[in-house]
Amino acid sequence: MLDPNSRYVSRLTRDTVALVLAGGRGSRLHELTDWRAKPALHFGGKFRIIDFPLSNCVNSGIRRIGILTQYKAHSLIRHVIRGWSSFKKEFGEYVEILPASQRYSPNWYQGTADAIYQNLDILQAEAPKYILVLSGDHVYQMDYGAIIAHHVETGADLTVSCIEVPIEEAAGSFGVMTVDDDNRIIRFDEKPQRPTELANKPGYTLASMGNYVFNTEFLFDQLRKDAADPDSEHDFGKNIIPNIIAEKLVSAYRFRDHDTNETAYWRDVGTLDSFWEANMELVSPNPSLNLYNHDWPIWTYQTQLPPAKFVFDDDSRRGYAVDSMVSGGCIVSGGKVKSSLLFSDVHIHSYAEIEESVLLPEVEVHRSAKIKKAIIDSACVIPEGMIIGHDHEHDKARGFRVTKKGVTLVTREMLGQQPAGTSAK
């Protein structure tokens, strides 16, 4: 039974350092991550994916945070510096960026475990009791104090946060585990094509969320052993966890909604389809992810922008948005927006029609353009009269990417415009 005392949990979180793994590209997002790491990708109208684990840390009372970066990290680093640099150093609080810097070898980060190992001296200087390793590219709201308390109460060497997901979703994408009646992990497979089915929930498997709580000295010992193994891929899911479950106590912490005890909201958004779907969920009347929860806010950096503006109300042109999220700085000037997300500084010109689409910051859609079921990357300028998402063969012929589920991706390069990596965003 977990101790519900808030001071007890607060003491545990103060004794914890969080390390956010934020160096991945997210290759299944294709051109959307050509110029940015996946954790830097915009999400939910005004946020970036990295804001979710960072906000979870802050809301949980964890104020010592390291962010490990590698792949095309400029926009991620810029966002963290602008939005997450106000911690009180005098109180021992910080968010530090830990780029691959070849501290222990001539190589860059070779895997998730190696990324932590290469910062071992920094962690030793901090001397926390517990280390919380987090994936930086998932969308969810989670109290990390609960999993740390679970870890301590069970006496585990390692605790893995997990969630029930459909087998077809987990196949080839997530690490999956088998547990006994005490939630001790007895088997762990990294991204198997045929995940083990849950006995009490047909069609589902128990998937790793990529979040781990370690006793600090235990983690250090395992990292040193792994670094000395020439056959290791230096990955938690592939090497560390499978190698220790037979001899050490590795516990599974099931992530559930505290109010309903059902499986909590968690999205990987690792494909274009899942990214589009997760954003589209937010425009529904009662989405599973509550961004309006004042008890668990998602913090972020945002520029000072004026309110969204809707202009023109003539019979022939009317600027409006319905069942949509429209961010600051947007102007809908005589255009129609339905079931869509407009990120900051988007401009929709007269007679343009946007439906079931995600428009990232600084997109401009000129007169009479029509966009349906699409993702438009940052700073794209959609020419007058262009039609996107209505004819997939035509989209493909112009070099746009169309997913299996019929979502069209458009980037600046596809439009023959200046690459996103050198634009304002």
From Swiss-Prot:
Pathway annotation: Glycan biosynthesis; glycogen biosynthesis
UniProt GO BP: glycogen biosynthetic process
Keyword line: ATP-binding, Carbohydrate metabolism, Glycogen biosynthesis, Glycogen metabolism, Nucleotide-binding, Nucleotidyltransferase, Transferase
Keyword Cytoplasm: no
Binding site for alpha-D-glucose 1-phosphate: Y109, G175, E190, K191, S208
CDD domains: ADP_Glucose_PP, LbH_G1P_AT_C
UniProt xrefs under SUPFAM superfamilies: Nucleotide-diphospho-sugar transferases, Trimeric LpxA-like enzymes
GO MF, any single term: glucose-1-phosphate adenylyltransferase activity
InterPro entries: ADP-Glc_PPase, ADP_Glu_pyroP_CS, GlgC_bac, GlmU/GlgC-like_hexapep, NTP_transferase_dom, Nucleotide-diphossugar_trans, Trimer_LpxA-like_sf
EC assignment: 2.7.7.27
Top-rank taxon, per record: Bacteria
Keyword ATP-binding applies: yes
Catalytic activity: alpha-D-glucose 1-phosphate + ATP + H(+) = ADP-alpha-D-glucose + diphosphate
Biological role stated in the UniProt entry: Involved in the biosynthesis of ADP-glucose, a building block required for the elongation reactions to produce glycogen. Catalyzes the reaction between ATP and alpha-D-glucose 1-phosphate (G1P) to produce pyrophosphate and ADP-Glc.
Quaternary assembly: Homotetramer.
Protein family (similarity comment): Belongs to the bacterial/plant glucose-1-phosphate adenylyltransferase family.
Name this protein carries in UniProt: Glucose-1-phosphate adenylyltransferase
